[in-house]
Amino acid sequence: MPVPPAPVPRARRLIAALVPAALALAALPPTPASAATNHGAAYQEPYRPQFHFSPARNWMNDPNGPIYHHGAYHLFFQYNPAGTTWGNMSWGHATSPDLVHWTEQPLAIPQDDTAMIFSGGVVDDRTNSSGLGTTDNPPLVAVYTSAARTPDGRQTQSLAYSLDGGSSWTKYRGNPVLDIGSSDFRDPKVLWNDRTGSWLMAVALSDRHQIRFYSSHDLKSWTRLSEFGPAGATGGVWECPDLFPLAVDGDPARTKWVLTVSTNGGPQHSTAVQYFIGDFDGTSFTADDPAGIYTPPAGTLVNGFDDGTYGGWTATGTAFGTAPAPGTLPGRQPVSGFTGPGLVNTFLGGDAATGDLLSPPFTVTRRYLNFQVGGGNHPYVQGSGDGSAPPGSTLADFQGPVLPAGWTATGGLAGITPTKEHLDGSLGGSVLDTFTPAAGDAATGTMTSPEFTIDHRYLNLLIGGGNHPAGTDGETTVSLVVDGRVVRTATGRDSGELNWSSWDIGEFAGRRATVRIVDNATGGWGHLMVGGLQLSDQQARPKDRQTAVNLLLDGQVVRSATGSDSEALDWTSWDLADLIGRQVQVQIADHATGGWGHVLADRFTLADAPALGMVQRAHWLDHGADFYAATSVNDEPHGRRVVIGWMNNWAYADKIPTSPWRGADTFPRELALTTVDGRTVLVQRPVRELEELRERRPWRGTDLPVRDTRLPLPVSGAALEINARLRAGTAREFGLAVHDGGGHWTRIGYDTASGELYVDRTASGTTAFHESFAAVHRAKLHLDPNGRLDLRILVDASSVEVYAGDGTLVLTDQIFPDPSDTGVALYADGGAARAESLTVRHLRSSWRG
């Protein structure tokens, strides 16, 4: 993915369009590396991957254009030559003889003053069809997205070519070669189409959730063929497509095509890659199972909104009108996924309309309440209110033309004054914004209030802007300083909306204090907006911006769901086992007035089984949190289909605690199609070249029992390959802990009650840099008929990759343990389990030969 997901990219594009000085700064061409870098012993920093590719320095995201050419694998990648956050996007370059040992090469394709270089692919133009080389010296051709430095951020497809085997690149003078006038048209992957004898491009129409196919005979002139989608998961934009054939069960006569698409609406509600298996006829792709045709469990209908009325439900406000909607309302994209002729759609006259729709009380008679929901992603927040300030004493409201008396500023923030901005949540017309007209997000510095006496219990802060907590590289924070020590801190939410944060400071009553604003961030969302500071004896309540479906028990919210910023409704299910026999109500709430400030809902049904949402029905390459932008190697010499992904997550990619680099790739995987229970499924395994890193003598254990405890094993290491066969026994949960020590560990286990494999990184080490990082990531998996679980686990200094179910299920997660925590342990909770066999191999660093 070339840019972070919404709302970030739109904010960045708008900001860039409004601030020419920021554009000029970003457009400065980087200085390419002068020579190849083989890092060796330098790759010893904390968290540095030892057998996963990472650049020596700076930011990296999507892998681009991997290809085997003249005895070497070439890997290109999205790269910022000037820093450790997203920006200045160019193509970095590395080479390897074996997919394991990588040498970083000089910068391949740099940004320039007209465009950044976004993702794409590389082909070997053996016949010189492009005319960019000669018959004797045909070119390598990179097909990539040019992201224009224009107000609309137009994205077009361009070419660069190499006549020296990929060492140096020249941009084609006729760029762009494909322009449809869109700002969401990116990430081309090109392959040779044997059926038509021409080049085939798959490229994403990101905001439409479509992949478009084009054909060309010379890589310069492209003809539109067809589109695929929307289909499968559409909770985030579509990016980084790939299309390739695979033989089923190794039989070339039974070849299917696989289309992969990256999206930010995956199984962990974030970064992921989905795939479709189907057929490609040379012009269009047809999925065998697009995951769109679904019949939910039958049940008792509460309301389907199909008779032209709300059926006794009570509407208040302006968002619902007098009757259900027939589908799409004027001014929006088409609504899809609803059942029957009517649904609830609160886009009535636009997103500014607000209100509630409340059902009559009904009795819960079945375990599940299934329904469809769509629209804006604005969850219900407990304790929220109207956004007003409680009674109190104003420290600063930033409504004047200059800073309040006594405030001081340093660095690039010196000279900043409040600016007039129309921000949702603002209590006045002005705000203190560290995004400066001259430098944009690049401005850094501090702003400090005069001393004051703490004479109220709470300090309420109205803030917005970047989410860069204290202690991370490039923080954007507001802090309370008492006796020279920071005692409270808050940051933004990567949002242009202002909302309240509140500190309980009663313990400091009577003490002298200051408020300090720190902006050390220079990348996207590298700024803060502060709308006011207030001392009060009441906590300020965050503004209620929900677009949600809530279940009320005695008037209190006990379940809640929201949309995914999509006009496609999807099934959601609530388990109401604890509420059977109780009287409840459904509330549909639209309290948002900004973008995506509406909710869609339909088909409330009590049932004995849960309905499955699209994310549950879609097919995923990886169920972990850190796998994205997967792309396959062109011209792989062994006839394999090998993919490499970006091992990171857009939610926290610019906050992970690594330095002087930020970003790594997954270990290369080989893909295959196999038949399981009559279905064609995709299986994955690490490429066999991993064996080159194995130490000679593995540790082996057999028949190891464990009951209600953690059993340390006599083996340790930060870079390991583990093969395990575990038997469930009576345990509720069982598995292995890696990077174990000092009270920290990462658990890779199985939950017998839910039937799920999981990676638990809640106690894995450093996790506080983002609120979503400390989490348990789960995926459904059946044990074998004998109650056994086979695992293959790749452990590196800052990651785990878990292969299970004979490669049908993979979970990839980053972790950031203390370097001294290298233990391995067997564990079982709630009963007994057993390791029938364990093999642990130490892996040598790929950076030291």
Which residue stretches match the model-derived regions?
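Secretory targeting and sorting signals
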Residues: 1-36
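Surface loop/turn signatures of beta-propeller and other carbohydrate-active proteins
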Residues: 37-64, 83-86, 100-134, 166-192, ...
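Hydrophobic core segments of beta-strands in well-ordered, beta-rich domains
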Residues: 62-82, 104-108, 123-127, 131-152, ...
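Conserved Ser/Thr-centered positions that define the repeating blades of beta-propeller domains
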Residues: 96, 160-163, 213-219, 671
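Beta-rich accessory regions
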Residues: 250-252, 274-299, 363, 369-370, ...
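Extracellular glycan-recognition surfaces and repeat-rich motifs
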Residues: 309-343, 399-433
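Short beta-strands within extracellular/lumenal beta-sheet-rich domains
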Residues: 341-368, 376-380, 432-456, 499-502, ...
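Extracellular carbohydrate recognition and processing domains
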Residues: 479-528, 540-580, 589, 594-595
